[in-house]
């Protein structure tokens, strides 16, 4: 008893680690036998004590935490604020997600800490508390889920679900929470991540790889080693774990004294000596070289010294031990623990966030303000940063609390502020934590409602790809979804139009857009609206042209139409154009469109180059019929250069023949292309269509224009059209004539038609007329006299249809057959014309042509003229009534088959169009336009918009324009490269004059606005920044400078008084000055001061379907000299206000698509987007707010909710839609904030439906360290798959090392050393990664087990093709050691590269085919082995088990080992090699020292750096 009394009583808790230490010390002191007796007594004692008290787990023991209620409430409040910010557009979706995750994670963690103290204080003997915190079962996270809250969940892909589970398992989950928690459940229906990585299967594969690894020798004689040094910041614990049980590869000296020799195993005593030495002399300490399984020279076994001590009895491993199977099971067995552990924790998210410090009580907070300086938190909220540890005191009524905040933390409250209990007062920054792997994640944002997309000017308007609708954001900006309610009816149920408004409206139909012109007085608008839609004979306008000009009796409106693929035209050219509707023609009432407009184009900044087209117009009389596609034929002179045959690029234009028209249509870049009905698309296909290049020359003889004449003005026309600003320049390089090829390429038609034209050239005097009979005869009379013509007199349109079909399509019609209209050609296509069918098969496709008309078989072949255009009946020469004659025919000469001399004549109807000869500048423009000044000249040029003899295809229900007239500008002064153009409107005594002033002197007005194109900016371009340079208009001198230059060409338009002035200018900051006197205002405003200049700014926005202009009203009774109003902003200052301003001030409001004039609002309304009255919010301005605030509101401005513009807040975010005197209307809109680099889906002004994708964010997030990733991660590494996005896939890294290292070293040695270094590098990296996963789970596995597996995974090399070898075939997988030995034996270098195989592939690439066959694919493996005649030497365990032999381990090892008699002499050989070994080591194997360490594992052995050779790269 006395002895027992003297013993020290250890009153400490003992855990697993302490037990391990105790047992190892007992074994050291007493040996194995005696220790087992002691442990039995401890076990008996434990069982006895455990059963004396019974702990039962009841539901009452699950105590919920009292503080949970207000903690959750606090988090909900923060989430609500965050949601509000998101709703206002202040934070974007990713930011909201991140903050939401942090709020709930911090709440959950705080609740977990509270749970611990709550148990400890209230019920320390609580069974749940005892069970989990003693480590017996479960952990804190599981108990937290039982009694705290489950918190945020991660789905199987590791993505966060941002809806937290607020309940715990004690309270029970709601249905939503249950479904979310199912995502975290393992082995459930939802989970897919773990199913593939079953622990048992992993163990099986691991054992399969290494089952043949047996300790067969004492020493393999290796001279390689791996260095371990604690100098790199390696922890002592890790250092000890690494060294214990290993064998030294070198003698170790301290000074000159040797303390350990080579091949000595390292025990705890030796390690302690190493540690004390390192502590004493940290800088002089040398690294310790140890042997590992990696360094063993054997191929299919391992030696005692490379393996080291056995884990079971602490001595060197015995010969015949199956260490491979032990290694496989050691790694596979904790996998079951990992799986079980993931099941218990259930996918609960664990992320790294900052710790929060909360106030212990209510009170006043105080700290030294000099020690902090203001900053912002990562979420943008204001905070203070403390550099050093900061002491904070909280003074409550009766107690003083003191809190110490560590350095680099954020203080979230101000000094002397009153704080409440549990309020967050500081945020502690987490220390330099381990490097978290980050991954790039895409987050899609979807529209929450139907609406129309708008964005600010910060978005690129050209899409990222040519045909795509994706745009990258160059900087952070807002997207707005304007509310609409979709409605198909064309009559508005709710209208914002006031009395006396003019409106144009049109509807959508299935196959195109129909636009109706309303020509009537104002008061008739209401009645005519209803019956416009009933008439069938309305003109169908071109769905794809950018602008249409229409008139309603007062104005010419410009209608941009919508086509999804052409609204970026302007953006691509980086030019800003605008069209001005200027003239109205009364004579043209009978035509479908009641006017034709002169469109004036002025490029961005108003700079005109030489030979620029400044204006053009399209005459509606020259519009193509709706009948279909066909050929335009004419004879030209002046524009011969521009419209030469364009054949060169026809072959390569053929991408996918079926979609030829559509895809080419999308490619057009400028507005002119649209006007010319996509001339390029059809011209370039000439070769393929089989219309001979010289066919149109037949017209030459008819019109009597000689060949040489028709080239006379080539250079001049090139001069006219060569301007880079202009699309109509000649393209000599692209479209040269190609006469030789056309004969060979195009088969029968071309040969025959060539004969035709020769035939016709032989009779140049004759013209042909078709009689009523079948024969065609020659007549000698000429209808036209030979005269010199500058322009084309007449052109013809001949119907023809072409189908380009895939090669594989089956035709339902025969070649040379006659078909009717609407005949089925293939399964999906029908003919639009009737007539002769010609089929031509090409390599890639089939062409099917349909020629309309009749077929005649002539009796005498020599009298027939092919390719002629013939009038059916005579007309007098002076007859001008009929501009369009449909009574011509076109005669074509065809051969039925190439081989037979059988001819027939195809007579095709043609439509003739006469050109207007008498038109000149005077007929188009007022007379004073011709007063040219200052060397500027204008020329009028007509041209035909189609290539001669080219097929023009019908597009939808379009009407193409055949003829366009252009106004071309030129000047003589050589030194002037460019002219400046601007538009001015002058009103004097009520007469309005519009001037287009073009001068050679640079204008004084500065153009500061950015470029805006067809879809750029919603209603008004700038919601935040006003980029107008208003200063240039503030002084009178600058205003008058507009008229300083005298080189005005003259007015473009004279109008009478009753036509109000309407100018639509571009957003390129053109201005106009209105001088007015005695103007009458409809509201009875008094006469304004005479000659007050009011600059008026306009914006033309080609929005979804119309124009927007805003106007400044006339303001009376101002004492100041002038008043500036830009973009309808109400900009009021107190000193400008007079008493009667409230009554007289009138702001005119404009709809989204509207034109506004001085006296009344004119709008056109897209009836397809009906505005719901409930989505428009009227916001009334208080009457007295005018004097108190100078806030600016303007039409089209986007306003976020709760912005305080006036006395009251804005109740809903949206766009200002109508501005009245005392109120304005907001169209409801939802803002979305999008960050730089985000991708916007969709087009500006596009209608989106609820759930459509709006934006895609790409952001980096720390990879959540969810426990589910334990086992799959290990399995991924073993299978050599990519495991994280930061370090590239190991296979790719090995490829890099394979390439770089031989290149650095050079020569045949490079491959040997390169493969060695690569394999060593990848092995160390892999071991570290696997250990990292296991250690994160608290599982300890000895490195040597992992090393044995990794050794097999990395032991193969692939023979490369660089050097041919007689032994191995290129691409063959061989063991590294085998490759080295073969190279030494053959005295020739074998070139090979290191390769990383996964464990499954290694199992199928062993020396034993019986082992492979028992693993997978048995039949295939055995068949291949039989064919190759493979021999299995039965060295492994599995082969012997399968065949029922004795396995070569344990007792069966003895007879196996006698095969090696040379084993005895091995030791002496090693001694002899020592000298050579030291030299070799210097050359080759000290590469391990190059390895840099990682901060996590921090020694050379545990390295994870990208490449050890970074300096060389």
Curated annotation (Swiss-Prot):
Compositionally biased spans, kind Basic and acidic residues: 659-679, 726-737
The cross-references to Pfam families, in alphabetical order and at most eight, read:
RNA_pol_Rpb1_4, RNA_pol_Rpb1_5
Q: What is its main location?
A: plastid
Q: Which domain of life is it from?
A: Eukaryota
The Acidic residues compositionally biased stretches are: 680-707, 738-767
Task: Please provide, alphabetically and separated by semicolons, the GO molecular function terms listed in this UniProt record.
Answer: DNA binding; DNA-directed RNA polymerase activity; zinc ion binding
The record's subcellular locations are: Plastid, Chloroplast
Q: What is the similarity comment for this entry?
A: Belongs to the RNA polymerase beta' chain family. RpoC2 subfamily.
What function does this protein fulfil? DNA-dependent RNA polymerase catalyzes the transcription of DNA into RNA using the four ribonucleoside triphosphates as substrates.
The subunit structure is: In plastids the minimal PEP RNA polymerase catalytic core is composed of four subunits: alpha, beta, beta', and beta''. When a (nuclear-encoded) sigma factor is associated with the core the holoenzyme is formed, which can initiate transcription.
The protein's name: DNA-directed RNA polymerase subunit beta''
